[in-house]
């Protein structure tokens, strides 16, 4: 729990020492994403999977959870929930926008226990396709760009790519993502690029929806696997399909991280879908946000623990 006093100190530190976040980022103790290839084969799942907590929704204007449109609006509450999650030994890291990464770095310096040391940190990149906007599928890079990822010494970048073949704006985002992959992987020491490809469509009311059918997911997996001049550093972030996960994830040899979403009161069903999908050979872990940080019963620690044990059975 982040007390009012601690949060006030964070606010003061931001106002009076804006340079501090970069200093802390550059001194952060990093770790590899996974164990080195030559260390595989020990029989343990240690070092072969990743469990990341996601907190990049607010920057896209998506602050609702369940039936509460303002659930993620209180930053102190959000940070408290994230610190609870990141303190779990089964959580390997974070996916977030610059503001949240910096908040957590600063909080760590104030408490004397870094929240992001020995964690994998992915920076969220394109947040411009605001939730519910008329231009939602035209999703430009408005958060971390390539230079920002390297300057803050993060471990990777994340791109969202929703593809609706009936909406020309999707093509703009496909190009943005391909260009970002090219720039990131052309650096002397490339970073991982996590791409979240989602088959999208508009319902009768014009609302954007995601199609999780096997056929639709296989189609976008094929498209994204070929983006950019190399796929060597590309990871896929995908929802559990509505059926037949092994068939879906057989569409590519690229590593996959499952996403969470907002399950409402169907959290147990979501956990079961993760457990089933985790059996596919390419699935290497989980990236979950609202489903664990704002569960229906508000037991953040309990839900994070259950998810961690799906990803890391040896816990």
Question: Which stretches of residues belong to each language-model region?
Answer:
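N-terminal capping/small domains of soluble enzymes
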Residues: 1-113, 120
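Conserved beta-strand segments of the P-loop GTPase G domain that flank and frequently precede/overlap
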Residues: 54, 159-161, 260
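Alpha/beta enzyme core
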Residues: 66-89, 93, 101-108, 112-116, ...
